[in-house]
Amino acid sequence: NVHFLWAASTMEGMSDLSIESAIKVSNYVSPEQIRNIPFLEFFHTIPLLSYVRFAKWDKVFSYERPDDDFKFSNSIFNYALSVAHAANGNLLEANRFQSMILNDIESEEVNAMVMAGHPTKSLMKIASLLASGSIDMYSSKYSEAIASFKEAVTIQDTLPYTEPPFWYYPTRQTLGHALLMNKSFEEAALVFERDLKD
């Protein structure tokens, strides 16, 4: 199962295999299949998720925006662009893309994915919070970033159990990093310990 290979290689930090597997999974799903089975749209987003995970910003910047009727894909596209711009110091563009992540959260297309059993709205909210927190991190606003990341962790903890998980990495890792940057070492240790237990 190439989807599991993508998830495992992403978790293990094997960037080349993660990206290769992500592209394969994405190519397996056609636009026509997504229109017939809405939750399959998730598989179209995973190359972007790999690019973000491994800081392949050039790949994010050159990625073609999905068709407008693929609302979840556009949300993840905006998330990826927001984080990439923040990492490159372009905070105006980072904020612009972050502001668009939840634009279509009540759309017919997103509701169809939710009705099919996919926690699409929760994933969009996590993406929005992570992008917002990333912007604050690159602005050295660690307290604000920590607040966003804590909220993202709370939402991720409510996601239904599945393998691979619905969100592509444990957001506690991002929270722990922000706590370290804020010199909140004891709290960071607790967050990383909880992540290992989960």
Located regions from the model:
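Extended catalytic-interface subdomain
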Residues: 2-29, 41-55
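"A position-specific structural signal for the A-helix of alpha-solenoid helical repeats
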Residues: 4, 46, 76, 80, ...
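Residue at a conserved register position within TPR or TPR-like alpha-solenoid repeats
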Residues: 8-9, 51, 85, 136, ...
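Solenoid-like repeat scaffolds
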Residues: 26-35, 63-72, 100-111, 116-121, ...
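Start-of-helix signal in alpha-solenoid helical-repeat scaffolds, especially tetratricopeptide repeats
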Residues: 41, 73-75, 82, 119-126, ...
